[in-house]
Amino acid sequence: MRYEYVPLKDQYEKEIVPALMKEFNYKNIHQVPKLVKIVINMGIGEGSRNYDLIERHANELAKITGQKPIVTRARKSISNFKIRKGMPIGLKVTLRGARMYNFLYKLINIVLPKVRDFRGLDPNSFDGRGNYSFGLSEQLVFPELSPDEVRRIQGMDITIVTTAKTDQEARRLLELFGMPFKRG
């Protein structure tokens, strides 16, 4: 395995772990919460009728994450949405390891500052088990995509999965990484 310098992982090991151990009085280093994975989900409503649309968004998501997305399919038929079981309805990428840390770094330092009218992430979007989810309304905020090659603006959901037992621990972990939460 080749060695790759990952700035956020280095910061986690040298600064964040000691700070969390002191703040939450952990006895063992393995009690300290850490990032497990980041899941990026892009639901494509018209994807079931237009396979070219799924291909285009799959290429965009691959450029953004550096990893090929998988196509998510409908689990059951819903006649009101004109969806049959097995139809493609979205794309999903699960990032772990160095790609996860690099994506989080890019998200915090490049992408979120480019979002229009951004006043911070909602601190109440934790799920009760230490995982954080939020949505982006357009994919154009990522530097890998140029406005000329994007034909249709599409949002995405991003879920950050941690080993934290409580939302308070997870929020503090993400704050130490530099995640911009709303104050108040």
UniProtKB/Swiss-Prot annotation:
Family matches, as PROSITE patterns: RIBOSOMAL_L5 (PS00358)
GO CC field: ribonucleoprotein complex; ribosome
Function: This is one of the proteins that bind and probably mediate the attachment of the 5S RNA into the large ribosomal subunit, where it forms part of the central protuberance. In the 70S ribosome it contacts protein S13 of the 30S subunit (bridge B1b), connecting the 2 subunits; this bridge is implicated in subunit movement. Contacts the P site tRNA; the 5S rRNA and some of its associated proteins might help stabilize positioning of ribosome-bound tRNAs.
Similarity comment: Belongs to the universal ribosomal protein uL5 family.
GO MF annotation: an example: rRNA binding
Domain of life: Bacteria
Protein name stated in the entry: Large ribosomal subunit protein uL5
Biological process, per Gene Ontology: translation
